[in-house]
Swiss-Prot record:
InterPro entries: RNaseH-like_sf, YqgF, YqgF/RNaseH-like_dom, YqgF/RNaseH-like_dom_sf. Gene3D superfamilies: YqgF/RNase H-like domain (3.30.420.140). GO terms for biological process: rRNA 5'-end processing. It is an enzyme of class 3 (hydrolase). Keywords: Cytoplasm, Hydrolase, Nuclease, Ribosome biogenesis. One of its GO terms (molecular function) is nuclease activity. One of its GO terms (cellular component) is cytosol. This is Putative pre-16S rRNA nuclease. Pfam families: RuvX. It comes from Burkholderia cenocepacia (strain HI2424). Belongs to the YqgF nuclease family. NCBIfam families: RNAse_H_YqgF.
Length: 149
């Protein structure tokens, strides 16, 4: 990471889905993450143009991609698609990609939106971005755990 240490890095996180990709932004120094936007996953061209626009706007130092798994930790259908997406991000944009186990991120995201009384269409629209926020927060929490050991 040129110019920025891992401790003060700006990060973008992605919750990859066949129809929608949730995006969150966070900062390793403040250990905070927030839901940013949901990209409609229409096709490869649309997907990477939208991601490229976000990278130009936010200029992250690294990317985090949620890796979907079954509750027992075994891969499922979306695992390989999410891996391919992360590898394509790395190849196209030259930014380091870290994988985060995203088991239960959607459940946590749903609960978080419910707690904040986000309802109906707004909840549906924000769910994937909120899941990306949960994924990124897990990553940031792991960073601080490592620093205290």
């Amino acid at each position: 990471m040129s110019g920025a240490s891992a401790r003060d890095a700006t990060l973008l996180a992605f919750d990859y889905g066949e129809k929608r990709i949730g995006v969150a932004i966070g900062n390793a120094l403040t250990r905070s993450a927030r839901a940013l936007v949901v990209i409609q996953n229409l096709n490869r061209e649309h997907r990477f143009k939208a991601v490229g626009d976000l990278l130009a706007e936010w200029r992250p130092d690294a990317l985090v991609v949620g890796l979907p798994m079954h509750p027992d930790g075994t891969p499922h259908d979306m695992t390989q698609q999410a891996k391919r997406f992360g590898n394509q991000l790395n190849g196209r944009f030259g930014l380091p990609v870290t994988w985060v186990d995203e088991r239960y991120s959607s459940v946590e995201a749903e609960a978080g939106l419910r707690e904040r009384n986000v309802r109906g269409r707004a909840r549906t629209d924000m769910l994937d971005a909120e899941a990306a926020r949960v994924i990124l927060q897990q990553y940031l929490d792991q960073l601080s755990d490592h620093e205290h050991h």
